[in-house]
Amino acid sequence: LGIENQQKVHYAMPLRHMVGDAFSYLKEYNELAVQNKKQKNWRNSDEFLSGLTAEDRLHPMITICIYYGEKEWDGPRSLIDMLKVPERFQALVSDYKMNLIEVRNSEYLKFQNSDVSIVFDISRFIYDKRYDKINDIYKEQLIPSELGLVIGAITESQKLIDDAIKLEKEGGKMNMCKALEELEEKGRI
């Protein structure tokens, strides 16, 4: 599993994912080929030539881009989106799809880890300026200061970061509603 954290849109991300995944596959292929060569696992010239036996399989590589920028992702989502291909040739061109998770459009995602849900929810609500929603859901709920630090970093709120660091040193938890009220009053969100 590969994770790419992006705060800015990267207009070559599908290509970057493809190359990274290809290098991972190539590394595993080379390791298998060396092992097969040492053990002389070849049953025929096809296996000898390819370096793999007919039964050899590589492990799947899954790469996910987590985009936490404030603006909507407007970059390509697959390799074909990056190419100038006449329509009549598009069916012949190999495509490579990128797995993209946008924090600001993550309401449809369900996470098993409640901390991840909190980070995505609060960050998304801050981006959408839906402070009322944060108040409705997280009213009086204390969250670990580490989560406040992550939310502050994602939303580029220095005040949230500073508050989280201060509370971290004191071993405390954060009330996001109170922290956001202070920020909203000061116009710093």
Task: Kindly give the residue locations of the regions a language model identified.
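Elongated, amphipathic alpha-helical interaction scaffolds
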Residues: 1-189
